[in-house]
């Protein structure tokens, strides 16, 4: 075989810019190879040493996450995390981002984001059972943001609906910081019932490497490097870096792979996602402690004139790399072909710890696996010791700086007009970040597979029956899995540490609100450039907050994704970073889905109760009220006492399991008034609320935000049993937790009284009109 490794006919400086590599990187590559890299090899290093693939800026921070626990079977490092959910079932889950591709091709960017995360799930041997998403867009007063929203939602619904996996929930927020750089994070869940988890390490020398799925084209070339750089006015030129997906091939790939995995004849599996064939082959070899040899002439190609560089860096979708038992090879190939998929042997596992690539009888790349995958460079950043001055000034803000409330009216700093408290409630309900997302949910098939317990928006978390796929496990299993994705980006902007603690706490709280016990998280860290002092400080502080909350709540991190350089440049080179957005994907288990509760009231005259912590703060600093009504993003987010947070959630779950509670809803964006409004809207019933707060501003009572607060309802016939339950738990929780009755479910109006003074009296149909039509009315 002819060696073409010494073909250096390229401009080094220009090529380094294309690959997002530095001069220091180039020198290190030369040192590791013992020679200069050729152009193909440089491209391979470019994608493998990108932030997207090797976490070169964030790896030291991620190392501090708690990753082990009683239920964790597979933690970070594999395609997805795996936890034990009992009954011989395992839950596989992960979250990923497709931010940059969605910014320039919203439909395909979002669609392939769904396809990619689904492959991460079934690559582990699990059947995908659900998808959730966390989305961020600029405000809807700009037509470009509306176009992005429409495109992304269409892409998600198209791919998920066609592949037959329900989209069961999520969150969406709007802010101008995302106008040039939307966020598209997709979380997927899968159910695994086989004894063995399929991993990615190629551990048997001489075994064939099987390419399965779609053909390889030029779409997505350099996608990993593109995802690791900032967006600018020239980013539309990167449309070829966006992949094009085919959900019908994905569906065939799911079924064919799951059938193949059941045979036990597949030794290892890896999705060809970010960095394509380069990443899948290098990681497969490195994870197995061996090497791999690939012949590009055997790769099914969509086009005839593809170079080695294009083959290796293509991110064409619906492709898998498998290591299989040689004696079962032909049977497996026929099995894949039955599903209309390509199935070609393109190489083998070798003992020499190198990735060796050949094309047209020439070696076009030969790189030690450790150089590509294991010993990737780490960028060392100094973390500033004190929070930035501008934040410290914001933290000194006090609600006393707001206008005085007179006759239940207050002046808005935003438009200098007087509004009643009732008008403010309606105003907040029309905020697209708070308002109903039904226009979006209606485009998703949330019921396919028939395991969805609550429709999107009905409960604080998605809930699915863990209905066994395997006949051996069909033993009257009534258990279910709950999932939620959460992040209050405004809080993280104002205090990355507290804001990230709050994101973990809220995601756990949402899971608890349906009656499920939080078990583990996956996270998607969406941040701006780590090369600025503030950018890296935000990332570092957020990771510290996530770690602290996960330890306290006993919800280990099983994996996730880091998406940096989320910022946009305008024509004048002015940089607009996104709000730091560490999205938390929480999963939990409920023993009996029949006991789960949703958010809306159930019966007229049911009692309404509030549980909370005296030690967890609530304030209007950093609140939706302060932002949307007054136009102020200031103050310090309230501190959450994590011990009390855990107590409140445990109390609630226990009460739900004993059938005391009829409905449950956490208090988050918009505060108590908005939480009550949402319960009324979902049930088409009113609420009569009597509060006894003293010495507090009325807007604080209605709109303050914080942790550890949940409203719930119960049938008045259960009051005696419930009070006995409260008394028993008070001995365990002490005097730091309060549980108090605040009202009852009524027929048609939401009425809130404080010290016998009526603050608002609104018809439920008024509330619903504002809440349900806000997003659709923006178009």
From Swiss-Prot:
Domain of life, per lineage: Bacteria
State any single GO MF term. phosphoribosylformylglycinamidine synthase activity
In the UniProt record, the signal sequence range is none
Q: What is its main location?
A: cytoplasm
- Annotated Mg(2+) 2 binding lies at 120, 271
Under CDD domains, the record lists: PurL_repeat1, PurL_repeat2
Q: Name one GO biological process term.
A: 'de novo' IMP biosynthetic process
* Pathway(s) where this gene product acts: Purine metabolism; IMP biosynthesis via de novo pathway; 5-amino-1-(5-phospho-D-ribosyl)imidazole from N(2)-formyl-N(1)-(5-phospho-D-ribosyl)glycinamide: step 1/2
Q: Per the record, GO CC terms?
A: cytoplasm
What broad class of enzyme is this? Answer: ligase
Q: How does it assemble?
A: Monomer. Part of the FGAM synthase complex composed of 1 PurL, 1 PurQ and 2 PurS subunits.
> What is the name of this protein?
Phosphoribosylformylglycinamidine synthase subunit PurL
Tell me the gene name: purL
């Amino acid at each position: 075989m002819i060696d073409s490794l010494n073909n250096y006919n390229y401009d080094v400086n220009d090529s380094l810019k294309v690959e997002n590599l530095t001069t220091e990187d180039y020198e290190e590559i030369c040192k590791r190879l013992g020679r200069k890299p050729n152009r193909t090899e440089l491209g391979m290093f470019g994608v493998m040493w990108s932030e997207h693939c090797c976490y070169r800026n964030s790896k030291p921070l991620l190392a501090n996450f708690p990753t082990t626990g009683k239920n964790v079977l597979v933690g970070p490092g594999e395609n997805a995390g795996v936890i034990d959910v009992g009954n011989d079932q395992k839950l596989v889950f992960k979250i990923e981002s497709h931010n940059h591709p969605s910014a320039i091709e919203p439909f395909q960017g979002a669609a392939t984001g769904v396809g990619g995360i689904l492959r991460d799930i079934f690559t582990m041997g699990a059947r995908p059972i659900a998808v959730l998403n966390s989305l961020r867009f600029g405000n809807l007063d700009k037509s470009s943001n509306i176009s992005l929203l429409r495109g992304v939602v269409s892409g998600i619904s198209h791919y998920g609906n066609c592949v037959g996996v329900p989209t069961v929930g999520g969150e969406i927020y709007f802010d101008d910081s995302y106008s040039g750089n939307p966020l598209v994070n997709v979380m997927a869940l899968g159910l695994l019932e086989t004894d063995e988890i399929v991993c990615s390490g190629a551990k048997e020398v001489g075994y064939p490497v099987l390419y399965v799925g779609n053909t390889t084209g030029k779409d997505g070339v350099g996608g990993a490097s593109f995802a690791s750089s900032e967006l600018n006015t020239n980013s539309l030129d990167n449309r070829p870096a966006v992949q094009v997906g085919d959900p019908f091939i994905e569906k065939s790939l799911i079924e064919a792979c799951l059938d193949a995995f059941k045979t036990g004849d597949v030794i290892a599996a890896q999705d060809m996602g970010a960095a394509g064939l380069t990443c899948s082959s290098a990681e497969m070899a490195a994870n197995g402690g061996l090497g791999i040899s690939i012949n590009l002439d055997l790769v099914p190609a969509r086009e005839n004139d593809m170079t080695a560089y294009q083959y290796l860096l293509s991110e064409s979708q619906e492709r898998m790399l498998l290591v299989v038992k040689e004696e079962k090879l032909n049977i497996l190939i026929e099995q894949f072909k039955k599903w209309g998929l390509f199935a070609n042997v393109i190489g083998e596992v070798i003992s020499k710890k190198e990735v060796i690539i050949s094309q047209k009888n020439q070696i076009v790349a030969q790189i030690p696996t450790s150089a590509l995958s294991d010993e990737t460079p780490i960028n060392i950043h100094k973390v500033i010791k004190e929070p930035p001055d501008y934040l410290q000034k914001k933290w000194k803000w006090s609600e006393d700086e707001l206008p005085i409330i007179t006759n239940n009216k207050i002046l808005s700093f935003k438009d200098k007009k007087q509004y009643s408290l009732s008008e403010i409630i309606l105003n907040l309900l029309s905020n697209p970040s708070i308002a109903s997302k039904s226009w979006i949910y209606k485009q998703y098939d949330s019921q396919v597979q028939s395991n969805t317990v609550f429709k999107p928006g009905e409960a604080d978390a998605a809930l699915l029956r863990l209905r066994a796929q395997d006949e051996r496990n069909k033993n009257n299993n009534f258990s279910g899995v709950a999932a939620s994705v959460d992040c209050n980006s405004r809080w993280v902007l104002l205090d990355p540490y507290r804001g990230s603690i709050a994101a973990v706490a809220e995601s756990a709280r949402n899971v608890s609100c349906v009656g499920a016990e939080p078990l583990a998280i996956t996270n998607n860290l969406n941040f701006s450039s780590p090369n600025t002092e503030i950018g890296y400080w935000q990332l570092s502080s957020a990771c510290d907050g996530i770690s602290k909350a996960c330890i306290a709540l006993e919800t280990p991190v099983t994996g996730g994704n880091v998406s940096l350089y989320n910022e946009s440049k305008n024509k004048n080179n002015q940089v607009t970073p996104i709000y730091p957005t560490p999205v938390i994907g929480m999963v939990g288990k409920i023993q009996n889905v029949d006991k789960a509760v949703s958010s809306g009231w159930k019966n007229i005259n049911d009692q309404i109760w509030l549980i909370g912590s005296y030690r967890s703060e609530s304030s209007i600093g950093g609140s939706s009220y302060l932002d949307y009504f007054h136009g102020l993003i200031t103050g310090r987010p309230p501190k959450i006492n994590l011990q009390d947070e855990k107590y409140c959630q445990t109390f609630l779950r226990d009460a739900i399991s004993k059938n005391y509670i009829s409905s449950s809803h956490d208090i988050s964006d918009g505060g108590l008034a908005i939480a009550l409004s949402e319960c009324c809207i979902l049930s088409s019933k009113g609420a009569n609320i009597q509060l006894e707060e003293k010495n507090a501003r009325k807007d604080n009572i209605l709109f303050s935000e914080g942790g550890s607060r949940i409203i719930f309802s119960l049938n008045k016939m259960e009051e005696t049993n419930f009070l006995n339950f409260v008394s028993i738990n008070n001995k365990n929780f002490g005097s730091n937790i309060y549980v108090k009755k605040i009202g009852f479910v009524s027929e048609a109006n939401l009425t809130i009284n404080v010290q016998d003074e009526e603050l608002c009296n609104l018809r439920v149909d008024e509330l619903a009109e504002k809440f349900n039509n806000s997003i659709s009315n923006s178009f």
